[in-house]
Amino acid sequence: MEFHGNPFYLTPPDQVAAVCGGYCSDPFAVLGMHVVDVGTGDTGHGAGELAKFLSHVPYPVSRVVTVRAFYPFAESVSVRVLDTNEVVPMQRIHPDGFFEAVFWERSEPFPYRLIVTEGTRDGGQGTREFYDPYSFPLLLSDFDLHLIAEGNHFRLWQVLGAHIVELPSPFANHQSPVASVRGVRFAVWAPNALRVSVVGDFNRWDGRVHPMRFRHEAGVWELFLPEEILGGTEGLLYKFEVKGRYGGYLQLKADPVGFYHEVRPKSASIVWDIGRYRWNDDEWLSRRQEVQRLDKPVSIYEVHLGSWRRVPEEGNRWLTYRELAEQLVPYVKDMGFTHIELLPVMEHPLDESWGYQVTGYFAPTSRYGTPDDFKSFVDAFHQAGIGVILDWVPAHFPKDMHGLVFFDGTNLYEYGDWRGDHPDWHTKVFNFGRTEVRNFLIASALFWLHEFHADGLRIDAVASMLYLDYSRKPGEWQPNIYGGNEHLEAIDFIKRLNEVVHEQVPGILMVAEESTAWPMVTRPTYVGGLGFDFKWNMGWMHDTLFYFSQDPIFRKYHHGALTFSLWYAFSENFILPLSHDEVVHGKASLLGKMPGDLWQKFANLRALFGYMWAHPGKKLLFMGGEIAQWREWDYASSLDWHLLQWESHQGIQRLVRDLNWLYRTEPALHEWDCDHRGFEWIDFHDADHSVVSFIRWAKDWRDCIVVVCNFTPVVRHDYRIGVPFNGVWREVLNTDWQQYGGSGTRVAGQGTGDKGQATGESGWEAGEVVAEALPWQNRPYSVRLTLPPLSVVFLKRCTHTT
């Protein structure tokens, strides 16, 4: 006698209602296979009805097996019993699509698959057979959950998110026809949610269909969906539907640890195998720790990928990651930069944010291609011997509802009080005091270093993290427990971030954009510092651009703005930035900031670059500066490459290339960039003539470079400076050379001409001077120079004789 088709069901009505209503927080207690003790009467019918029904069963029944499933779009659902290959139809016990099959003759679990027949979009039918997602055991290990809960899971992306995996058959202890099942393992942190579901085209975005299991130890929800359900794996669109416990909160969320997302304005996450790319940068990685030391040259080309170059013939579209690799790598290599720095490539919904309002902390933006495409981009730079630094934004995140904000119906990632709102950018501020949030951010940083082989991270808006009163008026903030304005939780996070990153990935660079005088930013945490490797020298940038924007007639009144930076140049490990922030929002381009007529504008820009490359500190130049772009930077259009048809713009580009070459090849210009032993004034008092001179020392003192700067358009004849050694001093670079668009004024004689084209009165080739045994400016020797207008001249002794 068969009882599969009987109208009697065993699932309690409240459980059926919870699943159908979308508020079931423990789906594994309801769905899937269950052994039911029918003697308890805890079924879908009363005890009396159950006893009456069981009286008709021709054998004793105390325990039975049920299989339950919820498929609201199914026309029929059946169970295939794998040990007998019997197909048993399931009974629809709720019109919304709750199905149940009761196996009265069985008392122990058995292997099975579900067969679901649904209507298709074209009016036909489609049938899928698969292992029940609710037949699989626990997915994440207890150790993983322990690390997540204590905030120390630094490979978080390997357990959370969506992963293509092959799991052992859920019936490995039975006679299962397969050893493993391929599919996608989903996991997300949402400790305060009532329910979290995986949704996508595979379940018509209905959050009731695939609710997840809650692992209360760490507040993580997990579910494995076989490939047969999903209709594939890689490239699959999905989101998490999060139902909160309070206020009827129901929201579709992108995966916080997703590796790939749709191009805005769409926002679904995309399943991607993050580990399949095969790298070809072993040589670079093996020597990275050596080439990224403080005593090595670091010259950075800052790039916004969406506007470096576009394709006007195709609707002004972006270049892809692979197209950028083909064009940008040889360009950066030719220009002599050692590194590029990318404005944030993490996924972000708003183009106007330039990438600084991130929703995908584990995903390169899909605007330019896939994660593998971006890996290929980084790989190409490494094979060319160029490092890649990524801008990374742990200070704040946007309020877009598909992102992190109010993720589980509570302030999960953000502070829930006044600290949670950023007054400048109208964004949310991470809760740096919560262990799981700190873990999320540290894991994100490590993700880019491990998975994408980034060589460093530049941390944006560090100052906004350090101070509780940042951009807040009195009454809008509260002091810390000591009565100060220091954000103690953020400071502790920054220190921990730098400690972990340097321990896990030796040799990478951590760079701070910190705009205040916070002490010891680039000192180790064990001596009280924040632990960064470098800090942007915003003071140098501000003072230098202010000085160069002045008419040369008035520069003598602002001489201190030029020289002040040397008072603190070695208090931190500095990078000198001429960044994207200085060429937008009405500030004008670098060329546009320069005073004077057309020739003087270009001469001033050449002098600015010469002074920057001569000044102690690593270098950073935003794209467009090297071609003397007239316009401010526009994120929505390409750089004005057509300007290179004019000699003046070619000259600036040629100068930047040669400055990089000189910086890389002359130890004096980089070995002691961050050490006071590498710099010594010759004379900084000549404010009346706006002339300064100094020595850049190398570790081998014989390789020193003397730098002389004339920041007026007046040629200074017979200008004497002291030098440390006798012998012949040769120009190794002069920003006034004609090949750069300058006047060609010779430092050693009369008339004009390019380097090496004429002979001066002394008999030396133009560009060379002989030191005289005439003490000057506390030096035993001196040279007599002709200083070209608006120029910076680099001199090096030709021989090592003393």
Where are these regions (language model features)?
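Carbohydrate-interacting/catalytic domains
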Residues: M1-G39, E49-F53, R63-D122, G126-F171, ...
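Hydrophobic residues within beta-strands of alpha/beta enzymes
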Residues: V77, V196, I340-L342, L457, ...
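Short glycine-biased active-site loop of nucleotidyltransferases that positions the nucleotide triphosphate
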Residues: Q91-R92, R213, L350-G355, K399-F406, ...
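Short, flexible loop/turn elements at secondary-structure junctions
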Residues: H94, A190-N192, F202, H216, ...
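Substrate-binding/active-site clefts of carbohydrate-active enzymes
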Residues: G258-E262, D282-D295, H304-E486, L785
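Conserved alpha/beta catalytic core and glycan-binding cleft of carbohydrate-active enzymes
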Residues: R264-P265, H453-D455, Y470-S638, L643, ...
